[in-house]
């Protein structure tokens, strides 16, 4: 029997997920998913500061061991991260005290004698990039091919582990796990195998597994891909929403985006596309999913009506365009307008109903982390360690720009980008992970 606290948590999470894209969001007392309780970056009425620096509005700053790019997850005064050795031999879960910043737990979970190489993807990835998910009493951590584990948040003991779910990640794993009812749902979009899988969150046992069904059109007669590598890869995390009383999971893979029944893994519909390495998480707004398909000349951003059966390209696409869309960072939706940061230093605002560009403004920098909206303001976090705060609306208006130090010794393998992990917000505090530190930002 579920505890009353767990029931309240799950009901709140399910209710806010169904409101994806709405600006009416309750104040956040936890951050259970890398895009928050609503899975779309909405914080609610948090009173975050507009400005901060290494000496202003930083409650604490703690060094994070080893290397990981996963986003912070917060519940019950615990901040959870994952990390790994730079070469990918050892994999850990980390727990910090949210009040003091103290590292209270470092649990070694997996070991690899011969880790998969990430090739030139190592500059944008790590061996601990998928973010954890948490609920009262349990935290779930995932390292792709290397393993998945469930830990007791009180004792820090391992409840279950799996290390038999395989694929060749080619440039490393990035897709984060998703909790849904009694399931933990994982995404494996490798260069060789592509599938989504639902595990019993209590035991780790497989409940369902569904292979991607895209028409690859890149095979020899013996089903071996003509070109191995990126062409079948994706990095996106699914979004689950409730539509007309039924749960639908939207998941973007290479060559197609899919709608699934998250309870059974049944494929409901498919939108074919011509791209690979999709990274942004889908959004849901007014009966449609907003999808970014990834890289290649055929990559695009599109709005797809939820529903239908089979391939729905001819019947369910509202709009699509193939320029000025985000390749890495997920968009955010406020009052019918989409906002996102591109990798060329610009932010873009698009009408979610029509796909028409409202404005384009220069932020500066490059972007991997996902934006948030809090207290009526949108926050963008750059690779260079800067945060730009803008006012939502039909005109581009910058309210503040803030910087945190990202310098590191030249021989430090972790030196480089500031924000690749997305932020977490609980109450009026924001938790930011750079390559080598975790910060708590809060007005003093």
Give the location of each predicted region.
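Positively charged n-region of N-terminal signal peptides that target proteins for export
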Residues: 1-6
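Bacterial N-terminal signal peptides
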Residues: 7-18
